[in-house]
Amino acid sequence: MDFEDAVRQVREKDQRYSPQAYDLVRLSLDHAQKLIHGEPKKGKAMVNRHVTGPQLLEGFRQHVIETYGPMSYQLLQNWGLKKTDDVGNIVFNIISTGLFGRSAEDNLEDFCGVYDFKETFLKPFG
């Protein structure tokens, strides 16, 4: 199963978030992994590049602001992402397909109320 298949499978049951929201979280996960673990080494077997919920949310924050700037808040709203809990819901939706892994310590509460979207994605550009 590839990422697009996983998103289709999830969205058959849960349409709260647009496909773009899922892509954004996937790209943010890549960004967070690079922040925490550095660039992946070419030719090396995949090693555990796990990040925690708060680490992923920091990667999400940086990626969104760098990519979308002043449009960040409105795009997130349009795609169904209104709070950090929504990022966690997307992560756990993809985990449920088996495409993303998780550690025993990972839980949805790691994503709850970590920061305010309006404060984070709108205020810096106001």
Name what the model sees in each region:
Residues 1-126:
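Non-transmembrane, aqueous-exposed alpha-helical and coiled segments at domain scale
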